[in-house]
C-alpha cells in the first residue's frame, strides 16, 4: 500500500512518523525528483517502483531557499529539493550547493502590483480618518517607497460619485468627521482620474465651483476663535476641529494635483467671501443646498446631525449659557447658605434642588451637626434645671462640639452609659454595705439601727434618682423590694428586740421564732443583693451524709465590715451588762433546744473550727430550707490579729454514750436520740481549715455545722462572755465531764458528748441542776465566747478549768 496511490507529502518533504501504516506512497526512488508521472495522471501507472512523483506539483521548490539551511543545525535531509546556497555534510557525504540560481522574478511582480496599486493607495489615503498634515507627509514618503501590498483588497470610494446612497452611508456610519478634510482631495482624484469615464462631469463641477477659495491657516484660526467666542465652547468645538486641516492638505501626492491647485488659486479673489462649505458639499456629491448665503446654517445643522450632537441656533445657545451660569450660581449659593448651620431655609433649598445637586460628605456632616445642635438647644430649653447632672453635662458637651462623626457620637453614647453604670454600681455597693452594717448594728445596739436606717435610705433615694433616667432592671427592682422589706422588718423588730433581755422563757421562745422568720427573709434578700453587688463572699462546702441534711455552706463577709464593727464593739464592751446577755443566751439556748439536733447517723464528723475570743456578741444566722439544706451565714467581726496567735487546737474525741437531759415538754422530740446512739464530734484547729480562701487579714473564720429540723426557720444567736457561770460549777461535775486526761475512756466519751451537745436540747434548760450549768458552759465554749482557751493538760487539776474559763 505505501507504494500505491498518491505520494506522502511528509515523506518527500519532511519526515513521516507513520511508517508502513501510512496510507500514502513512500518511494525512496522518487526522492528528490520533482517530475510528475504522466501515467499516474492518466491513472494507468501500475509500476511497483516509480521514479516519478505521484503528486501534483504546483511550486518550483528548487527555487525556494531551504529553511533549515539558515538554522544552527543546518539541513540534514539527503534528498532535499529546496535550494541550498552552501554545501553541507549529511551522514558524512558532502552535498554541493544547488546548481540552479535563484531568480529575481518574485520581486518584479510585487513592484508591478505596487505600481498598479498606487492609485488605490492614494484613494485609501483620502478615506483614512486621522489625516493630519504630519500623517499625510509620512504617507507620501511611504507611497514613494516600496510599500508591500495589503493583505485584503482596499475599500476604494470614488469621491466624484454623486450617489446619495454613498452619502447616506457616510452619515450613518459617523464618518462625517472626514468630510471637511476631503476639501482638496476631489481635485486630487480628478487630476488622477483624467482617463476616467466620469471626467466630463467632474470638469463641469470644477467649472461650477471655480469661485471658492482655499483659506490660509491664519484665516481658519481667526474664524475658529470667532466661532468659539460666539458659541461659548458649545457646539463650535466639533465644527472648528473639522475646519482645522484644510490648508496644508493640497498637493501631497503628485504633480498633476499641484496643477489643479494652481488653477484653483489663480481664480481666487481675496476680496470675496469664500464659499468653502458650498463647494465642498457640491464637489463631494453631498446634499446640495441653494447657492445663496443661506447655506451656512444648514451646513452647520448637517454637520451637527452627522456628529450626533444637537446643535441649535446661536440664539438658543446664548439662551443656554445663562442657564448654566444660573445653575452654577445657585450651586454656590446653596453651598454658601448650607455652610451656615443655623439657617433652615438653606436646608429646604438644598432639599428642593437636591434632584440636581449631589451632596458631598462635608455638606451632609454640616447638616447633621446643625440638626443635632438645634435639637440639643431645644432640649436644654424645655428641660431646664430639672435635668440630672449627667444629662446636662452631656448636653453641654454636645453643644460645644458642632461637627461630630458617627464614630464620635457612638463613642460618647457608650461613654455615658459606662459612666452611668459605674455610678449606679457604686451607689448599689454603698447601699449594700450600709445595709450589712445596719444588720450588724441591729444585733449589737438599738440606737445604731436608726442611724443605719437613715444612711441606707439616702443611697436608695440616689438610686431612685438615677433610675429616673435609666430603665430599671429586674435586679434593681429586687434590690428595692429587699430594702423595703428590710425597713419594715427593722421597724417591726425594734420593739420586741428591746424586750429580748427579759428572762421569761415562753415569751423569749415566741420572740426568737419571730426573729427567725424575719432573719430568714433577710437572708434571702441578702443573697439577691450579694448577686448584684461586688461584695466578695467566701464560701465553703462540707458534705454531710444525714437523713435530712445534705449541704452546709458558710459565707463570710468582707474585712471592711469587720473593721467597722470592731470600733462599735469596743464601745459596746464598756456598755454591755452581763445579766441581760445571760438572758439572751438562755432564750437562744431554749430555742435551739426545741430542735431535734441529734438526728444524725452514727459516724458523722463535725468540723468545728475554734473561734477567736471576743467580748462582744456575735450574730449567727441559720437558715434551713424545706429539703433541710442548711446554709450557715456567719456574719461576724472580731479582733483577729490580736488573739490569733493564742489559739490552740482543741481535741478530737469520740462519743460512745448518749445522755439526754431535757425538760418534760420537749420529750417527744428527743426520741430521735435513741435511734442514733453514736455521734462523732471532730474539732479541728484553725490552721487546718484551708477551705476558706481568705487573705491573711481575714483569716479569722468560723466553720460550724448545725443540723436542724426540716422546719423553715432561722435564728439569731447573740452571745456574750459569761465568766461567772464557770465559777458556779462544782469541781466534781467539771472533773467528771470536762477533763479527759484524768478520766478513763467512758468518762472522756461522756465529756465529748457534753461538748457535742453545745447545740443540743439540754442547753435550753434553766440553770437549776449542775449538769445544765455545764451544758450552758460548753455552749458558750463552742460558740467562741472564751476569754482564754481551755488547755486540757494532764497536769492540771479539776478546779483549774473554771478559773481558766
Curated annotation (Swiss-Prot):
Encoding gene per record: ZC3H11B
Biased composition (Polar residues): 391-402, 750-763
Function per UniProt: May play a role in mRNA transport.
Pfam families the record matches: zf-CCCH_3 (PF15663)
InterPro entries xrefs: Znf-CCCH_3, Znf_CCCH
Disordered, as annotated region: 140-194, 223-351, 364-433, 449-468, 481-506, 715-805
Gene3D superfamilies attached to this UniProt entry: Zinc finger, CCCH-type
Swiss-Prot/TrEMBL keywords: Coiled coil, Metal-binding, Repeat, Zinc, Zinc-finger
Positions with biased composition (Basic and acidic residues): 364-390, 412-433, 455-468
Any coiled-coil regions, as ranges: 403-423
One record GO biological process: poly(A)+ mRNA export from nucleus
Ranges of compositional bias, category Acidic residues: 160-175, 789-805
Biased composition annotated in UniProt, kind: Low complexity: 486-498, 730-749
Name of the molecule in the record: Zinc finger CCCH domain-containing protein 11B
Amino acid at each position: 500500500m505505501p507504494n500505491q496511490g498518491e505520494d506522502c507529502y511528509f515523506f518527500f518533504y519532511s519526515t513521516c512518523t507513520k511508517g508502513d501504516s501510512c496510507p500514502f506512497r513512500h518511494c525512496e526512488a522518487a526522492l528528490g525528483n520533482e517530475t510528475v508521472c504522466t501515467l499516474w495522471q492518466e491513472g494507468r501507472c501500475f509500476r511497483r517502483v516509480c521514479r516519478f512523483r505521484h503528486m501534483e506539483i504546483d511550486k518550483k521548490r528548487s527555487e525556494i531557499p531551504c529553511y533549515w539551511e539558515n538554522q544552527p543545525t543546518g539541513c540534514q535531509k539527503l534528498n532535499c529539493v529546496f535550494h541550498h546556497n552552501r554545501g553541507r555534510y549529511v551522514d558524512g557525504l558532502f552535498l554541493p550547493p544547488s546548481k540552479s540560481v535563484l531568480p529575481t522574478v518574485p520581486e518584479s511582480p510585487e513592484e508591478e502590483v505596487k505600481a498598479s496599486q498606487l492609485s488605490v493607495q492614494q484613494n485609501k489615503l483620502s478615506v483614512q480618518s486621522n489625516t493630519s498634515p504630519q500623517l499625510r507627509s509620512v504617507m507620501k514618503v511611504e507611497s514613494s517607497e516600496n510599500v508591500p501590498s495589503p493583505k485584503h483588497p482596499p475599500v476604494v470610494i470614488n469621491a466624484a460619485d454623486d450617489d446619495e446612497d454613498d452619502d447616506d452611508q457616510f452619515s450613518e456610519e459617523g464618518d462625517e468627521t472626514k468630510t471637511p478634510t476631503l476639501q482638496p482631495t476631489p481635485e486630487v482624484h480628478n487630476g488622477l482620474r483624467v482617463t476616467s469615464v466620469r471626467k466630463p462631469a467632474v470638469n463641469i463641477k470644477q467649472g461650477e465651483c471655480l469661485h471658492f477659495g482655499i483659506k490660509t491657516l491664519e484665516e481658519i484660526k481667526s474664524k475658529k476663535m470667532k466661532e468659539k467666542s460666539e458659541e461659548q465652547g458649545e457646539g463650535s468645538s466639533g465644527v472648528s476641529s473639522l475646519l482645522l486641516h484644510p490648508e496644508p492638505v493640497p498637493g501631497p501626492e503628485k504633480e498633476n494635483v499641484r496643477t489643479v491647485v494652481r488653477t484653483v488659486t489663480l481664480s481666487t479673489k481675496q476680496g470675496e467671501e469664500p464659499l468653502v462649505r458650498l463647494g465642498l458639499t457640491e464637489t463631494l456629491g453631498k446634499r446640495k443646498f441653494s447657492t445663496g448665503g443661506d447655506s451656512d446654517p444648514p451646513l452647520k445643522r448637517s454637520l451637527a446631525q452627522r456628529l450626533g450632537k444637537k446643535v441649535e441656533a446661536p440664539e438658543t445657545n446664548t439662551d443656554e449659557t445663562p442657564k448654566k451660569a444660573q445653575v452654577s450660581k445657585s450651586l454656590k449659593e446653596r453651598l454658601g447658605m448650607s455652610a451656615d448651620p443655623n439657617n433652615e431655609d438653606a436646608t429646604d433649598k438644598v432639599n428642593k434642588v437636591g434632584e440636581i445637586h449631589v451632596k458631598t460628605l462635608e455638606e451632609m456632616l454640616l447638616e447633621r451637626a446643625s440638626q443635632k445642635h438645634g435639637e440639643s438647644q431645644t432640649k436644654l430649653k424645655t428641660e431646664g434645671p430639672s435635668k440630672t447632672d449627667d444629662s446636662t453635662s452631656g448636653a453641654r458637651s454636645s453643644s460645644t462640639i458642632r461637627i461630630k462623626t458617627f464614630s464620635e457620637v457612638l463613642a460618647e453614647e457608650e461613654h455615658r452609659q459606662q459612666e452611668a453604670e459605674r455610678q449606679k454600681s457604686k451607689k448599689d455597693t454603698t447601699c449594700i454595705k450600709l445595709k450589712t452594717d445596719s444588720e450588724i448594728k441591729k444585733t449589737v445596739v438599738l440606737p445604731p439601727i436608726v442611724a443605719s436606717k437613715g444612711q441606707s435610705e439616702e443611697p436608695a433615694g440616689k438610686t431612685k434618682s438615677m433610675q429616673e433616667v435609666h430603665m430599671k432592671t429586674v435586679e434593681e427592682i429586687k434590690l428595692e423590694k429587699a430594702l423595703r422589706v428590710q425597713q419594715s422588718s427593722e421597724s417591726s423588730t425594734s420593739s420586741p428586740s428591746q424586750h429580748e433581755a427579759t428572762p421569761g422563757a415562753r415569751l423569749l421562745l415566741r420572740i426568737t421564732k419571730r426573729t427567725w422568720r424575719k432573719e430568714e427573709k433577710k437572708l434571702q434578700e441578702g443573697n439577691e443583693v450579694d448577686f448584684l453587688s461586688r461584695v466578695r463572699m467566701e464560701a465553703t462546702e462540707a458534705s454531710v451524709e444525714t437523713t435530712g441534711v445534705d449541704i452546709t455552706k458558710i459565707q463570710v463577709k468582707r474585712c471592711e465590715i469587720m473593721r467597722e464593727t470592731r470600733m462599735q464593739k469596743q464601745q459596746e464592751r464598756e456598755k454591755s451588762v452581763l445579766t441581760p446577755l445571760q438572758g439572751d443566751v438562755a432564750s437562744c439556748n431554749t430555742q435551739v433546744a426545741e430542735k431535734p439536733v441529734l438526728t444524725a447517723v452514727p459516724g458523722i464528723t463535725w468540723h468545728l473550727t475554734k473561734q477567736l475570743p471576743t467580748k462582744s456578741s456575735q450574730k449567727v444566722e441559720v437558715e434551713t430550707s424545706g429539703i433541710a439544706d442548711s446554709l450557715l451565714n456567719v456574719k461576724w467581726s472580731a479582733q483577729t490579729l490580736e488573739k490569733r496567735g493564742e489559739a490552740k487546737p482543741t481535741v478530737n474525741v469520740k462519743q460512745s454514750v448518749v445522755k439526754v437531759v431535757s425538760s418534760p415538754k420537749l420529750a417527744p422530740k428527743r426520741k430521735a436520740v435513741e435511734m442514733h446512739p453514736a455521734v462523732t464530734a471532730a474539732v479541728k484547729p484553725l490552721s487546718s481549715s484551708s477551705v476558706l480562701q481568705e487573705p491573711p487579714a481575714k483569716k479569722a473564720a468560723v466553720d460550724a455545722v448545725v443540723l436542724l429540723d426540716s422546719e423553715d426557720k432561722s435564728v439569731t444567736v447573740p452571745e456574750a462572755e459569761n465568766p461567772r457561770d464557770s465559777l458556779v460549777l462544782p469541781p466534781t461535775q467539771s472533773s467528771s465531764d470536762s477533763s479527759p486526761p484524768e478520766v478513763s475512756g467512758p468518762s472522756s466519751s461522756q465529756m465529748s458528748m457534753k461538748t457535742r451537745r453545745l447545740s443540743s436540747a439540754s442547753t435550753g434548760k434553766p440553770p437549776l441542776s449542775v449538769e445544765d450549768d455545764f451544758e450552758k458552759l460548753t455552749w458558750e465554749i463552742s460558740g467562741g465566747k472564751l476569754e482564754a482557751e481551755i488547755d486540757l493538760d494532764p497536769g492540771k487539776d479539776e478546779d483549774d478549768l473554771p478559773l481558766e474559763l
